[in-house]
Structures are given as structure tokens and as C-alpha cells.
Amino acid sequence: MPSETNGQFCVPAKLYRIGEIVRHTPFTRQTIHNYTTMGLIRESDWTEGGHRLYDESVFERLWRIGQLRKDKTLTEIQKLFKAEERLQVAAS
């Protein structure tokens, strides 16, 4: 799990369960699950009980999906994200 250094301590990154994400966003549990299955968002880890855990970047990604949904289908968003990922890989 990634961590950040605050100068003196190595602080582990906060991971969120689906329920926490649902409480802080307009998305339902089923929508989060569907977006994960489609590859629009990715879990960062799993609990020992098999529950998905997401890092803080999921909130920005969900906000972006919400904005894109105003004029794009989920399939179009999926293609856009895949194209962006290919560009990032090519640039590195």
C-alpha cells in the first residue's frame, strides 16, 4: 500500500470501502460495483474478508465520470480512459 511521508512519519494512505464512498458521493453501491467491473475505477486493495478498498483518487475519478456522463455514454467514457492510459504508458 502506498504511503506518504509528512517529514517525520511514514503515514499510510487511507483506503475506503464502498460504503464510505457511497456516503460521500452521489453514487450507489451498485454503481460503484459496475464502474469497477467496467474498469472505470480500480480497487487499490482488498480486505481479508474480500471487500474492495479504494484509495483517495477514486473520488476525483468519480467526479470526472459524473461530469463526462452529462454528454457521454459509459462506453465512450471507458474508451476515453483507455486512450488516456495508453498515452500515459507511451509517455513513460
Please place each PLM-identified region on the residue numbering:
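Key DNA-contact positions within bacterial/archaeal DNA-binding proteins
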Residues: 30
